[in-house]
Regions:
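Bacterial Sec-dependent N-terminal signal peptides
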Residues: 1-27
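GH16 jelly-roll
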Residues: 20-290
């Protein structure tokens, strides 16, 4: 099972509505990078090592707010993300609040619940820091409980989801680690997925007690996701063309999201989940070729 990589090309809906990406911007253009070369050929062009105390750097990140996607249980709020002891700490909490968007009789999952029962945080890289090609590293520690859905992922800056392209550098749910790519299908708001996963039984019993390094290596013709230096999934960018608009969503700049979702379509039941629960990020680094 450890060596088995399953490629699934299927059409599915990820969000309850299409997600519109940020407007076109001037971004880091990192150039095609030869990932077979020594790391000394790389230069650091953007990073956050979270070596401050308190709120994350507002020049680098913005926050999602409210109920956002996938019928997840958490209400996103910036208060659940802090920098402490050299880490970004995203905390999932069980706490009850009034839902300010509640509408009596609503059939929309975001507005038909009168209370918020769980909170968490989702950080989004500010648009001026979006990057294209090169290498991104995220060192993080996740808790592998049922109900938790931590993620490291990117979205393209142009177009609505999924035609803007999605890269799930890391997701955890269903007792497995996932690495996925998504492009647009011929049907609006539906994705074609290239997915890979490894069950937690593939890893050492103490795996979740340590930090791990997730890497996205990105050239003009290939993207590859690695976990602790081992390939999890890759995609040929000469063929990753949207069925919807004929564009290649991985030949444009992408921006990063770091979030801890709770429950929802993939996270599972929260009945036995321990709260508060923390997702720790040691650093994010983006490199270009020298």
């Amino acid at each position: 099972m450890f060596k088995l990589i399953i490629f699934l090309f299927l059409t599915t809906i990820l969000f309850s509505n299409c997600k519109t990406a940020v407007e076109p911007i001037d971004s880091y253009s990192l150039g095609s990078i030869d990932t077979t070369k020594n790391a000394k050929t790389l230069k650091l062009v953007w990073s956050d090592e979270f070596n401050i105390e308190g709120s994350p750097d507002s020049t680098k990140w913005r926050f999602e707010s409210g109920f956002v996607r996938n019928e997840e249980a958490q209400w996103y709020q910036k208060e659940n993300a802090v920098c402490a002891n050299g880490n970004l700490v995203i905390t999932g909490k069980k706490e009850r609040k009034n839902n300010p968007n509640f509408i009596i009789g609503s059939t929309d999952w975001k507005t038909n619940r009168s209370f918020i029962d769980y909170t968490s945080a989702s950080l989004v890289m500010k648009k001026e820091h979006a990057f294209q090609y090169g290498k991104m590293e995220v060192r993080a520690k996740i808790i592998t409980q049922t109900g938790l859905w931590p993620a490291i992922w990117t979205l393209g800056i142009n177009g609505e989801w999924p035609s803007n392209g999605e890269v799930d550098v890391m997701e955890y749910y269903g007792n497995k680690i996932l690495a996925n790519f998504a492009i647009g299908s011929a049907t609006r708001c539906k994705a074609i997925w290239d997915s890979s996963s490894k069950p937690m039984s593939s890893f050492d019993a103490n795996w979740a007690n340590s930090y791990h390094l997730w890497t996205l290596e990105w050239t003009e013709n290939k993207m590859e996701i690695l976990l602790d230096g081992v390939s999890m999934n890759s995609i040929d960018l000469t063929t990753s063309i949207n069925k919807s608009d004929g564009k290649n969503p991985f030949r444009q700049a992408h921006y990063l999201l770091l979030n801890l979702a709770l429950g929802g379509n993939n996270g599972g039941s929260l009945a036995n989940t321990t709260f508060p629960s923390q997702y720790l990020v040691d650093y994010v680094k983006v490199y270009a070729q020298k």
